[in-house]
Amino acid sequence: FLNYRDSGMIDSPTTSNPECFWQANIEEASLRLSNLLCEESVDLLVIYDPNGGYGHPDHIQVHRVGTHWADQTGIENIRWTTLNRDSIKKTIELAIETAPDEGLAGIGDDLEERRQRVEEESFGSAESEITHAINVSDFIEKKRAAISSHRSQIDEDSFFLKIPNDQFVNIFGTEWFINPKESRKENETFKSNLFD
């Protein structure tokens, strides 16, 4: 966090803490990033998309600070990590259909709320905007454990922790990225190397 505090979600009182990352001055945070990376030879910078993935203030700030730092240092090879809005929407719709059969009765309101949230343009990115897809399904159990331990973002009764493994893989088995300097043509396959 470049020695800033976690901001919490946008509606949390912690976002008004002057020591949290959300409140950080972009120039100052960029200088801290520069000090951290001064001995590195940066070939590629990976930051969040402008939405911060799902709207987390710290993720949005990572985008702002990283973009500013790249502009100041002349780094042109940037990738935005994002969420595939279309893929998540399909998985949520499948979960709504199969919830009773999968023993997930009682999470219908959570699923409906998430379906509506995924419809918003401030959540992730449309698949048509995504240029890179990296298969990380070999690490799915580690990802599930990491998400489960991230209590400031995920409640223990969250849909994401209750869905069957195949649906979890649909959402989290691929990492999605955007090259903001190019677009993917219709029907063109996703690139699988961030340096391409």
Please describe what each predicted stretch is.
Residues 14-15, 24-196:
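Metal-dependent de-N-acetylase/amidase catalytic core
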Residues 20-22:
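The substrate-binding groove and active-site-proximal loops of carbohydrate-active enzymes
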